[in-house]
């Protein structure tokens, strides 16, 4: 995964460092088995069904129980996390081994044998289970935020998804019947151990797409439930090293060994700890940090290290600042909101608000310049298609409220009042308050409302009905690319392709510009990644001209573990350590 292409190599090579000790992964000798890994944090995942996962926390959890065809290996060297590696696939397809056709539109993937579901009795994972997983991406109840990747890539996926959208989203039987009676031309099980994919056009990043957690195999039992429903969440099935033995929504998870998992069938994961306990409901990063330092907990679930603690921890081997080139957070405008006479649907209003933001204040909130840099583009540095630009400069990154006021007056919309939901964990409240102060200096009032992390992503900003009803006007989500390396589409397409806007879409503001959509298509069909990069740059420029979002920070991830944690290897796409490789001592 994440093949480094021309023009990107220099960017990625700069992302190998970390501040703090943090690299003692192999310093404590041979791994020991046993013990309970204790993880504490704030909010539940927005989706537990692997088909629907869309956040870094959900990605990290899914890795423990839902395997994909390919994946990446956790490492504290950023470069080592980039390559695509086999997971349930037996080998990497190539033109040399005959698994990629001469036209580069046919991929044959052969499955690793011996992988089983945690069913009673155990049952082999087959190619048909992967076909089911791909079909579920477009289910009408809880569709995948990443379905657009495959609609634009796989033959027949668009037609399949259109038909699936007409099925009753509350009827598990009807959805199951649709899947049985229809098929995606581009995803076929040749036999129990062989998958054949047919692409609309050659796609140099197709293997990257097959590492994404929502492409995991789905057991036949999942057809009994409405996807990601409460009932489904209580009946997850595993083919990874752990299984979810107990789940209390919004409160806790208990993961225990999956007895059907075998190390010799899994090249990416290990299994050392006996149990993994995840305790939720703790919004204060200070409280979480205190528990880890006192040895009451081992890892934070969804909280970075508190800003106030960073100076004293810089030389602590348990602390690290890990590179996660991302847009975290960014300010998104609900372009569909009817509030203020539909003001946010007007480009001139959004352009005016670009000048409001004091990025220097936000950098202080998250931990200073070693943790975050100001961001002015849709695509952050270290990602394919990045080109430095600053269309809306302000003195010392501190904002220009006078210009913001002037442009709002000129646009005919002074005195806006904007509904602003914010996440309650980590420093998100402080970020929201800082942005509210910036807007107030421009004469814009904000109505702040606390919104738990799970609800924030799962419903508030990802539900089109909420957007069209004006239940929110601005929000500050974050975006970590789904993969690194040859990853141009992992930012522009999910966040700004207006053609895939709908339930669970990550194009939260409903932005839709035919010019940008056309540039996305051009990039996806470009013969080489280097050519695609030019189209992504053009799309970035157009999106910023439209002021669809306000990029705020390119932020690294601060992370800390307890004294008893060893083999702490980082996964940038999950913004956390790989739970399956950790082991514990009694220290």
Whereabouts are the PLM-identified features?
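N-terminal lobe/hinge region of extracytoplasmic solute-binding protein
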Residues: 40-100, 237
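Extracellular/periplasmic solute-recognition and catalytic clefts
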Residues: 245-256, 265, 277-340, 365
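Structural transition elements
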Residues: 242, 340, 370-407, 425-430
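Extracytoplasmic/peripheral linker and loop segments enriched in polar/acidic and small residues
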Residues: 30, 351, 363-366, 447-458, ...
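Gly/Pro-rich hinge or "lid" segments in bacterial periplasmic/extracellular proteins
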Residues: 73-77, 167-194, 198-277, 402, ...
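Aromatic- and charge-enriched surface segment that lines or borders ligand/interaction sites
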Residues: 91-156, 196, 291, 343-345
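Long beta-strand-rich cores associated with HINT superfamily self-processing modules
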Residues: 559-587
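Alpha-helical secondary-structure segments
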Residues: 38, 125-133, 192-202, 240-241, ...
């Amino acid at each position: 995964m994440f093949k480094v292409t021309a023009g990107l190599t220099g960017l990625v090579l700069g992302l190998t460092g970390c501040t703090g000790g943090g690299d003692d992964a192999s310093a404590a000798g041979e791994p020991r088995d046993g013990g309970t890994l204790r993880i504490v944090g704030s909010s539940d995942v927005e989706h537990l069904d692997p088909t629907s996962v869309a956040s870094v926390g959900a990605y990290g959890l899914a890795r423990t129980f839902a395997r994909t065809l390919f994946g990446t290996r956790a490492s504290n060297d950023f470069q080592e996390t980039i390559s695509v590696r086999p997971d349930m696939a037996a080998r990497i397809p190539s033109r040399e081994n005959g698994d990629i056709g001469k036209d580069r539109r046919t991929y044959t993937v052969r499955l690793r044998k011996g992988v089983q579901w945690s069913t009673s009795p155990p049952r082999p994972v087959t190619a048909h289970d992967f076909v089911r997983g791909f079909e579920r991406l477009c289910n009408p109840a809880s569709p995948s935020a990443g379905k657009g990747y495959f609609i634009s890539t796989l033959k027949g996926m668009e037609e399949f998804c259109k038909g699936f959208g007409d099925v009753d989203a509350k009827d598990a039987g009807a959805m199951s019947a649709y899947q049985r009676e229809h098929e995606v031309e581009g995803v076929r099980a040749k036999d129990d151990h062989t998958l054949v994919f047919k692409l609309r056009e050659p796609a140099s990043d197709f293997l990257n797409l097959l590492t994404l957690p929502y492409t995991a195999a789905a057991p036949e039992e999942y057809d009994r439930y409405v996807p990601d429903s409460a009932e489904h969440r209580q009946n997850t099935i595993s083919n990874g090293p752990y299984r979810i033995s107990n789940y209390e929504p919004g409160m806790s998870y208990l993961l225990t060994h999956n007895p059907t998992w075998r190390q010799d069938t899994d090249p990416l994961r290990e299994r050392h700890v006996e149990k993994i306990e995840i305790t939720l409901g703790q919004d204060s990063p200070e409280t979480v940090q205190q528990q880890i330092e006192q040895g009451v907990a081992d890892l934070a679930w969804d909280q970075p290290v508190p800003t106030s603690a960073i100076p004293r921890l810089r030389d602590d081997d348990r602390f690290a600042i890990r590179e996660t080139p991302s847009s975290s957070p960014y300010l998104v405008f609900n372009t569909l909101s009817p509030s203020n006479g539909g003001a946010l649907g007007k480009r001139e209003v959004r352009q005016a608000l670009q000048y409001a933001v004091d990025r220097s204040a936000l950098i202080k909130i998250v931990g200073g310049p070693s943790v975050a840099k100001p961001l002015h583009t849709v695509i952050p540095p270290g990602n394919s298609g990045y080109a430095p630009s600053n269309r809306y400069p302000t003195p010392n990154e501190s904002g220009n409220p006078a210009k913001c006021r002037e442009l709002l007056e000129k646009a005919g919309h002074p005195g806006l009042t904007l509904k602003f939901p914010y996440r309650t964990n980590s420093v998100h409240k402080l970020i929201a308050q800082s942005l509210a102060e910036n807007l107030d200096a421009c004469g814009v009032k904000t109505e702040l409302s606390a919104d738990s992390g799970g609800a924030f992503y799962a419903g508030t900003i990802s539900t089109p009905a909420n957007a069209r009803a004006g239940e929110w006007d601005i929000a500050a989500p974050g975006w970590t690319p789904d993969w690194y390396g040859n990853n141009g589409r992992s930012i522009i397409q999910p966040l700004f392709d207006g053609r895939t806007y709908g339930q669970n879409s990550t194009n939260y503001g409903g932005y839709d510009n035919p010019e940008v959509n056309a540039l996305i298509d051009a990039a996806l069909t470009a013969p080489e990644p280097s050519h695609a990069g030019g189209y992504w740059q053009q799309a970035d420029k157009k999106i910023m001209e439209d002021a669809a979002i306000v990029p705020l920070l390119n932020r690294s991830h601060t992370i800390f573990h307890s004294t008893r944690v060893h083999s702490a290897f980082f996964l940038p796409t999950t913004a956390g350590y790989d739970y399956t490789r950790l082991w514990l001592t009694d220290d």
